[in-house]
Amino acid sequence: MATEKPHINLAVIGHIDHGKSTTVGRLMYEAGAVPAHIIEQYKKEAESKGKGSFAFAWVMDNLKEERERGITIDIAHKRFDTDKYYFTVVDCPGHRDFVKNMITGASQADAAVIVVAAPDGVMEQTKEHVFLSKTLGIKQLIVAVNKMDAANYDEARFNQVKSDVGALLKMVGTNPDTVKFIPISAFEGDNITKNSDKMPWYKGKTLFGLLDELEVPDKPTEKPLRVPIQDAYSISGIGTVPVGRVETGILKKGMNVTFMPANKSGEVKSIEMHHEEIPQAVPGDNIGFNVRGIGKDDVRRGDVCGASDNPPAVAEEFTAQIVVLQHPSAITVGYTPVFHCHTAQTACTFTELVKKLDPRTGQTLEENPTFLKAGDAAIIKCHPTKPLCLENAKEFPQLGRFAIRDMGQTIAAGMCINVVKKQMR
């Protein structure tokens, strides 16, 4: 197994045309993860379609439909190595209706690179991306100000974008001084692996240098096992193979596991990562595994796998702390939007507005408010309309954070602070 280096999941986030996929393609290419002849082939193909600059982006957008439309749709997992780490890139789509993909992508990330184009600067979506990165608990951020070639490598422009993004970070309670900013051109390759002579005014490290400064998150191996399922495949000769990322605990061959809320159990026969069989999987590993006694219809996206003697909680109702990002009118009791939590998407009804909080300090402003509007923070109670695995965010951050979506937009984001468990036995 070639995993001696520590592993980091990296989300690359950005507005639709800000060069996110090109940045990822360039990283992969410079790290030697993409053979030069493939890039050449993509280049020719891209030029013949009049999209010459998309060559690196095509490394990521390897889905036919995406190529035609020039947008990243599903989350692509790619691997590349730096001197110090090996990275799995979660390329998060930037289109508006893909924010929910981004939520499930970003919630798997240990660190994020937010790509902002120098000529355009901060866009509406950039705000949402910064906010979601915060809500989804991504502590380490690098802001790559891309397309510097299109801004004449101008230092003043870089500083302007830096201060605009800095203002956004402050809004969500992140100190901009803890975030690394770097001017790049993914297309030209400036400041990716070597410092660009076109921007002598930038004295910092290259993008690869900054990636090597990231810290590997502590692996919560001592916690109970939790694996949110992204998909379940039927593979001939093997059977059903659920796929997901281990969030906490250790998954071992021979273990008895239970999938919730499906309430189906079986024994782990084999575990695979990056197409190689492994004896056990630890937090951060994106894996496929085969379970004896589990059929194709027993497991679906949104289920969570745990040890049979300590299965994931299924929420009868839950209390959450949320921040309302946007809503055309007011949110009242009875509102039933879709909650995107780990890989699940489930409609939940607001059953009680417990209190309104000051978003900056967390102090209570009002008990039992009659409604909530954009900008409010609150404690609420909710009831899932169908079984949903949800855990207290203090114990299992990855299974307790969520985004709330309705009408094609992210309405709110938050975390679960208490779960009333459903009896499943």
Swiss-Prot record:
It is an enzyme of class 3 (hydrolase). Residues 5-221 form the tr-type G domain. Residues 185-187 are annotated as: G5. Residues 91-94 are annotated as: G3. Residues 70-74 are annotated as: G2. Coiled coil: none annotated. Pfam families: GTP-eEF1A_C, GTP_EFTU, GTP_EFTU_D2. It is found in: Cytoplasm. Belongs to the TRAFAC class translation factor GTPase superfamily. Classic translation factor GTPase family. EF-Tu/EF-1A subfamily. This is Elongation factor 1-alpha. It comes from Methanospirillum hungatei JF-1 (strain ATCC 27890 / DSM 864 / NBRC 100397 / JF-1). The gene is tuf.
